[in-house]
Amino acid sequence: MSNRDIIVIGGSSGATAPLKQILADLHPDVPAAVFIVLHLPAQGIGILSTVAAGAGRLPVHQATDGMKFERGHVYLGAPDHHLLLSGDHIRLGRGPRENMVRPAIDALFRSAALHHGPRVIGVVLSGLLSDGAAGLNAIKRCGGMTIVQDPLEAIAAEMPQRALEAATADLCVPAARLGDVLSELAREAPGAALPIAPDIRLEVEIAAGERIGSAILADIADPAALTCPACGGVLSDVKEAHPMRFRCQVGHAYTADALAKEQEGQVDEALRVALRIIDERAELVQRMAADGRRNGRPAIAEMYALRAAEYREYADMIRRVVLQSLDLPNR
């Protein structure tokens, strides 16, 4: 009899401690393969391997392309590759980044949902923004079980809270109980298989690097008057997405909050560049005014002095906007 033998776990900020707890508490005879993606800098992947290997009793492996996975083993995402499942093998995809990261939690979750449906248990841990919420929703749509770490105890509550809202999670569990809960759920028979929605299949193919282009994207998204921060292409609004998401023609994907965060960074950078240019312009025109005075051209000097004062006013306005942006609360 089949069981829930695929466990996928995702997290980012503040997720290392609960992950260690889960791995320490998973039963050594758990009848499931465990796949983990944490959104970390590339250099953090090695640290994750060390932490995971020393945390529990299950063998831990760095995922490689084509690797056949086994129950009772743990597999970690590789740097700069999406961790994807295909049948009983692992695929490493070089498709576009999602929320500016690769490997992406959502890509792993979708591929598990596509190939293993109700046999999947998805878990979202502590983290910022809404990474993992879309993938958890895909697992739910394919008949799998969805779990989030209790946001009240998470170091960064956004990810589990957004996942709760987007996927109507089956369970909300403190980290101290997750290992035991997963071990017990893995022994249960899965529910009935549900039809696979075309958008889930297509987005898995995009993550694998197999499908790109605006014509393909038109099947799942409508054009939006927005620009991709990564490539400058046109973004499209993914239809009926929970949470709201966007993809560009190249395939870069963003939840609404991740896109807003990237836009804020671009606005801040643009304002700072504008401030530097105007400050330099004021300095140059002031020097031209001084040169006019030295050379007996008072009218020219006065004109340049007035212009320099105008530029300084513009610079002060931009400087106030930049300083105000630093005081805004994180969103």
Residue ranges of model-derived segments:
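Conserved acid/base catalytic micro-environments in cytosolic active-site loops
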Residues: 1-290, 313-330
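Short helix-adjacent coil turns
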Residues: 251, 292-299
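Short, charged, amphipathic alpha-helical segments
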Residues: 298-309
